[in-house]
Amino acid sequence: MRPATLEFIKQQFTGYYQRVYPVTPDALLQREWGFIFFDAGREVRMRRHLAFGERQELTEYLKTMVPAHVFYSSAYYESPGAPTMAEKGWSGADLIFDLDADHIMHGSYQAMLARVKEEVQKLLAVLTDELGFSEKYCEVVFSGGRGYHIHVNDLAVRSWGSAERREVVNYVCGIGLDPGLLIRAGTDLSTGWPRRYLGALDGYLAWLKVKNQKDALLHLSSIKGVSRSSAAGLLKSLDQVRATIGGDHPEKVLGDRVLRAVTTNDNPDWKKRLQETGVQADEPVTTDIKRLIRMPTSLHGGSGLRVVPLTISEVQEFDPLIDAVVFGDRDVQVTAEKTLTVSLLGNTYEVSAGTQTVPEAVAVFLCCRGLAEIAEGR
């Protein structure tokens, strides 16, 4: 990044922190803070093990230091500013889920943001409808980058260790499912993982049905434990098997030896389908009881977008490419290395290779993402 570009971004961030009073997490006195600063060097370094006694102290720090990224601990500590983790005195942590589009799909920035929001809504439904968390304890935060964080601030989970959090994220993501326990006679198969599992299985069989039969036979017989003859038998009985899944006793299909072999991790196509049925959350974030997470209302140094806190009711209508933009439309000259398209503020901007004038918000976005530089002699 050129010095002029770095200075431009810092000026924009400075202006933002001068005019905004940040939202701070509950129990500010018990939180550790970490910051990454604008630096011309390539090595990214975080300054952490910091603590603030009051909101105004943090506000002045942001105004003075103007960080590129702002983080605080999901954990609560007796001495959050202690220089080592052992000295901090852990006393609990919020339950955090991280949904990052990079782990879900690849595509345009706009498409990735739309796709990851689907996962947010899926996760919220699981948390509230199946795991019983109250909506008032669930906060959604747009990360300012490619995803969202969901904070569960329920006192009932604060003392949980990594093992308990692992159980929750395993359920949410559908890891280690035992179909024999899920799909049993007399259980409600219309909700939760029983419904999702049967839906995934029916979808997989429907995929086999429309697939070229030679390719379907080759696919099935390549799975460990499935012979060519047994694969052919399953293909011939697909309609009957699917009818059983949709009938009164879907648990009967679990007795089929071929289906048991097909629905294991040895079958990557089934594994992927089942994974997509669950929530595609970043598991290590949830199990980490000392995680640093982005501060809502701060700016993301990799995009220039605001880290936006949301209630559950606000998620549906939220558009990060409009609602997380905090900069204006004054003209700024930038130089792009290649032609690209940017969707921002409800408009689509065609940016050509070379030097041109774009709105300030677009300039910040492009420069933060490393897609353009401030034009020389602007």
Swiss-Prot record:
What biological-process terms (Gene Ontology) are attached? DNA replication, synthesis of primer
The protein, known as: DNA primase small subunit PriS
- NCBIfam families from the xrefs? primase_sml (TIGR00335)
Q: Which HAMAP family match?
A: DNA_primase_sml_arc
What is the annotated role of this protein in its UniProt record? Catalytic subunit of DNA primase, an RNA polymerase that catalyzes the synthesis of short RNA molecules used as primers for DNA polymerase during DNA replication. The small subunit contains the primase catalytic core and has DNA synthesis activity on its own. Binding to the large subunit stabilizes and modulates the activity, increasing the rate of DNA synthesis while decreasing the length of the DNA fragments, and conferring RNA synthesis capability. The DNA polymerase activity may enable DNA primase to also catalyze primer extension after primer synthesis. May also play a role in DNA repair.
Q: EC class of this enzyme?
A: transferase
Q: GO molecular function of the protein, one example? A: DNA-directed RNA polymerase activity
User: What cofactors are annotated for this protein?
Assistant: Mg(2+); Mn(2+)
Q: Where is the active site?
A: 98, 100, 282
Q: EC number(s) in its UniProt entry? A: 2.7.7.-
Name the source organism: Methanosphaerula palustris (strain ATCC BAA-1556 / DSM 19958 / E1-9c)
Q: Which family would the database say this protein is a member of?
A: Belongs to the eukaryotic-type primase small subunit family.
> Keywords, A to Z?
DNA replication, DNA-directed RNA polymerase, Magnesium, Manganese, Metal-binding, Nucleotidyltransferase, Primosome, Transcription, Transferase
One GO cellular component term:
primosome complex
